[in-house]
Amino acid sequence: MKGGKRVQTARPNRINSEIRAQEVRLTGLEGEQLGIVSLREALEKAEEAGVDLVEISPNAEPPVCRIMDYGKFLYEKSKSSKEQKKKQKVIQVKEIKFRPGTDEGDYQVKLRSLIRFLEEGDKAKITLRFRGREMAHQQIGMEVLNRVKDDLQELAVVESFPTKIEGRQMIMVLAPKKKQ
C-alpha cells in the first residue's frame, strides 16, 4: 500500500514539544541542577545549546527534564543493553549417557566431553541406563557414577546424586565449580 499513514512508534521518553507540564525540574548537559523553570524557558535553553529537552521522570512533581542530545542518549542506551546481553551466559544442561558396561576407551571420550561442558560453564547430566539383566547389578552402575564423580571432583560439584534407581536409569547432575 503506497502512501499509507506511518504510525509513529511511542518513545519511552517525551521530548521537546511532547512535554505537557507547565514547570519542570531542569538538569543541564553535564548533569548539573538548574532548578525549577517554566517549560518555555527550558525549551529555549535546550534550543540555545542545539540539543533536545528530554523528560526523564514524568511522575515526579514537577517532572524532571534534562538537556541532552536524544539521538546520542538512545545510542548509548542501546549500546549498554547490548553489552549487558553479551555478558549474560545462558547455562545449559548437557547430557552424557553411560551404561554399566561402558569400556575404558568410551569412558575416557565421554569424560573429556564432560570436562569440556563443565569448563564452558554448563551443567552436566549423567544418565546411566540399564538394559535387561543389568538391572540385577545396580551396584556396578553406582560404581560408574562414583568413578565419574571422583574423576571430576576438581571441576564440578555434585548437585544431585541418585540414591535409588528411577525406572531403568540413574541420573546424576554436576555443576561447574565457581572460579575464584
Curated annotation (Swiss-Prot):
Site (Important for 30S binding) residue list: Y107, K110
GO biological processes: ribosome disassembly
GO molecular function, one term: ribosome binding
Location of the protein in the cell: Cytoplasm
KW Protein transport (keyword) present: no
Key words of the record: Cytoplasm, Initiation factor, Protein biosynthesis
A GO-annotated cellular component: cytosol
InterPro entries recorded: T_IF-3_C_sf (IPR036788), T_IF-3_N_sf (IPR036787), Translation_initiation_fac3_CS (IPR019813), Translation_initiation_fac_3 (IPR001288), Translation_initiation_fac_3_C (IPR019815), Translation_initiation_fac_3_N (IPR019814)
Transport in keyword set: no
Domain of life, source organism: Bacteria
Similarity comment: family membership: Belongs to the IF-3 family.
NCBIfam families: infC
Protein purpose: IF-3 binds to the 30S ribosomal subunit and shifts the equilibrium between 70S ribosomes and their 50S and 30S subunits in favor of the free subunits, thus enhancing the availability of 30S subunits on which protein synthesis initiation begins.
Assembly with partners or alone: Monomer.
Protein name: Translation initiation factor IF-3
Species of the source: Salmonella typhimurium (strain LT2 / SGSC1412 / ATCC 700720)
